[in-house]
Amino acid sequence: MKSFFLTLFRQQAALTKKLSRVVITLVIVLCAIVAIFRVWAFYTESPWTRDAKFTADVVAIAPDVSGLLTDVRVTDNQLVNKGDVLFVIDQPRYHQAVAQAEADVAYYQALVTEKRRESGRRARLGVSAMSQENIDQSNNALETATHQLAKAQAVMSLAKLELDRTVVRAPADGWVTNLHVQSGEFIERGNTAVALVKKDSFYLLAYMEETKLEGVRRGYRAEITPLGSEKIFYGTVDSVAAGINNSSNSANTKGLANVDSNLEWVRLAQRVPVKIRLDRQMGDLYPAGTTATVVVTGEQVNNDKKPSPLIRLLYRLREFG
């Protein structure tokens, strides 16, 4: 009797062990199916790209006058405020130009005063004392002197403007970058001396494949993961480019269309720039030109909750294709 119960117990234990293995196997298979489905949905349903660039408004700063650089007051990658002096150009030369222009104005003012007095005197005497030709000559001389005075005043205004332009100031708050001029160098008018990356002007340009544009609309939310980072930032689709360059629509020397010879069964999807407005500016944490992965999640509102380990893993995988 004892052996019977022992045998029955062993059979039940074996059955329980077998059922446990089956259950564990089913759970593992189910988890694998769920994981595969999430990966598939993550890669196919949500429009995404790993070809996205942080971008900012950049001002190419070039002087409006030529001359020697006498004072460079900023360093490369320095944060400056609007109106801060960046560099100063040879002011003594332009001070001399202003002084000369002021002297010319004073001369022509005196000349106009003299010609006006002479013209008035002759007009009062009239044709009884002199010929009409002499009166006309006096009036013409006054008119000529008046025009010369106006020209001298314009030259003086331009000289003062150029003197003011010898001090180059920051047009906005931002970071000075690619500074490649030094004191003592001669700088030409119109030649870019430095670039200014505007503060609080950062946005993202995501280059989406044309096959994914149906899921991209103005106002849709987007998740942004900088390359090599686990942080996720959020933004909103601002606009989609209205057109891109058509490389097949070029003309040869005779004006005929030049069509690329593409294989019919190989069609590469074109990439279209999508501008994404960031929810918050990050300063210079991610410089303009650095790369990020973007997922357009649709109309739902994102929050700053930490993503699951699986989602973080998928973001990592996307960085490698």
Curated annotation (Swiss-Prot):
Record function comment: Forms an efflux pump with AaeB.
Gene that encodes the chain: aaeA
Database matches in Gene3D superfamilies: 2.40.30.170, 2.40.50.100, Helix hairpin bin
Organism: Pectobacterium atrosepticum (strain SCRI 1043 / ATCC BAA-672)
Principal location listed in the UniProt entry: membrane
GO molecular function, one term: transmembrane transporter activity
Protein name, per record: p-hydroxybenzoic acid efflux pump subunit AaeA
InterPro entries, per the entry: CusB-like_dom_1, CusB_D23, MFP_Efflux_Pump, PHBA_efflux_pump_AaeA, RND_pump_MFP
Short name of one Pfam family: HlyD_D23
Lineage top rank: taxon: Bacteria
Membrane topology, as annotated: Single-pass membrane protein
Cysteine pairs bridged by disulfides in the record: none
GO cellular component: plasma membrane
Segments passing through the bilayer: 22-42
Keywords: Cell inner membrane, Cell membrane, Membrane, Transmembrane, Transmembrane helix, Transport
Subcellular location per the Swiss-Prot or TrEMBL entry: Cell inner membrane
Family as reported in the entry's similarity comment: Belongs to the membrane fusion protein (MFP) (TC 8.A.1) family.
